[in-house]
């Protein structure tokens, strides 16, 4: 077998000297891998987990990015089949912020197309015997079934020890396969909703680079060091770019600002780091995320050392777009009044047109073989259920009158429901 498992080697750069101390030569390779084929039916979303190929010799990942390609290797744009998000993990290795999970998350990318690139002299250690896996969510905006592949390009250094980095995953809803939450959207114009997650640093080091991930309605991700009383980095969304049609979800940022620093942001053992996700709260935003992945080079840090200048890939940040997502299929069937719930089968809701009184606690009973959910598209208050299969239930109490338009986020063109909540 070749030194790299079943990969397409697209370029081998000239050997370069990196690291600290006496100059040495390291072979830096640009390697291209592909996942297995993923088939997505029209106007549906799909999630997949898979073991994937990785470098089969010991070395260091110094950069990585991902996209979707067709069978000929052509890039598939977001307006056709969207790489909504993809997470790469090293199977069997403990995760930094979710140590009970034996899958170390070391890179992720979404609609914002973040590409990780470490400063010279640093790398994410990888053994030839390590195994990689991915979790991907794709959305097909086309009327036909399409098969695509996740292509990931890895910059890989061998032949010399680099200073190792550790990936730190900060997440508003950590340690879940689908770490979403909902912004209710019940505030006045200009109001915001903030959610926070804290991490007490178990070791000292320097943060060399970081990128963020948000969904529609996102305003900013703020990484701060509460021990030192300072903001370390703010990742801001950009919204300029083509909007995939038809809309299968609220459009997310086309870019999130990221930073890189060869000196690194100093953090000391015991420091309380906080990531704050800020969303618009003037209208509902469902199934949102607030995630940042940062790369730490462990080293001694004495207290609250000065933060160096950062090289920031800013983009063109601005306020989130206000785009109403329509129901792609009109709910049908008789109007069901004052019922307390309904069933959810494969690709349909039992009662699609419902009228209930304010204060009703409504329960969806899942009976399908495949995962489905209940997600608000537009309405007075944002809410959603987890992906659920047969035997599961989800309940919501309607406290505000109005029209609630719902769909299954995995099958938005096939599964729709409208619930009218009356005052009396």
Label the predicted regions.
Residues 2-26:
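Secretory targeting and sorting signals
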Residues 2-3, 218-222, 416-418:
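Short amphipathic alpha-helical segments with coiled-coil-like heptad repeat character
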Residues 11-13, 17-19, 39-41, 62, ...:
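N-terminal non-cleavable signal-anchor helices
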Residues 27-204, 211-324:
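Beta-strand-centric surfaces of beta-sandwich/beta-rich domains
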Residues 210-211, 365:
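Short, conserved beta-strand edge motifs with alternating hydrophobic and charged residues
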Residues 324-424:
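Extracytoplasmic copper-binding redox domains, predominantly the cupredoxin/blue-copper superfamily
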